Curated annotation (Swiss-Prot):
CDD domains: KOW_RPL26. Belongs to the universal ribosomal protein uL24 family. The keyword rRNA-binding applies. The gene is rplX. This is Large ribosomal subunit protein uL24. One of its GO terms (biological process) is translation. Keywords: Ribonucleoprotein, Ribosomal protein, RNA-binding, rRNA-binding. GO terms for molecular function: rRNA binding; structural constituent of ribosome. PANTHER family: MITOCHONDRIAL RIBOSOMAL PROTEIN L24. The lineage of its organism: Bacteria, Pseudomonadati, Pseudomonadota, Alphaproteobacteria, Rickettsiales. InterPro entries: KOW (IPR005824), Rib_uL2_dom2 (IPR014722), Ribosomal_uL24 (IPR003256), Ribosomal_uL24_CS (IPR005825), Ribosomal_uL24_KOW (IPR041988), Translation_prot_SH3-like_sf (IPR008991). One of two assembly initiator proteins, it binds directly to the 5'-end of the 23S rRNA, where it nucleates assembly of the 50S subunit.
Length: 113
């Protein structure tokens, strides 16, 4: 199992495939399948039947993409970057961009022991 460094709400860029170079926000992360749904990327058309609640028709929606095909966007430069983990002086664990050293986001309430 791959260690997931991508979280919901992160800004990512697609690095391979049909949507290469397209940027978007992570909408959902599927931990078991190592996939993410990125807004505006990997669009598929789904045919739905009409029922009591909604009309039928063709719906365009995002489909999951493997996490190896996306990379974080460096907050400083706007280019793709790898992610590292670092502990701050107050003991909180954060994700940082390897290229610029900028903080991408906090990991949680983890405390260094």
């Amino acid at each position: 199992m791959i260690k997931l460094k991508v979280k919901k709400g992160d800004e990512v860029i697609v690095v391979t495939g049909k949507y290469k170079g397209k940027k978007g926000k992570v909408l959902k992360v599927f931990i078991d399948e190592n996939t993410v749904i990125v807004s505006g990327v990997n669009l598929v058309k789904k045919h739905t039947k009409p029922n009591k609640m909604s009309e039928g028709g063709i719906i365009t929606k995002e489909s999951p993409i493997h996490i190896s095909n996306v990379a974080h966007i460096d907050p400083k430069t706007g280019n793709p970057t790898k992610v590292a983990f670092k502990f701050l002086e107050d003991g909180s664990k954060v994700r940082i961009a390897k290229k610029s050293g900028e903080i991408i986001g906090k990991v949680g309430n983890d405390v260094k022991i």
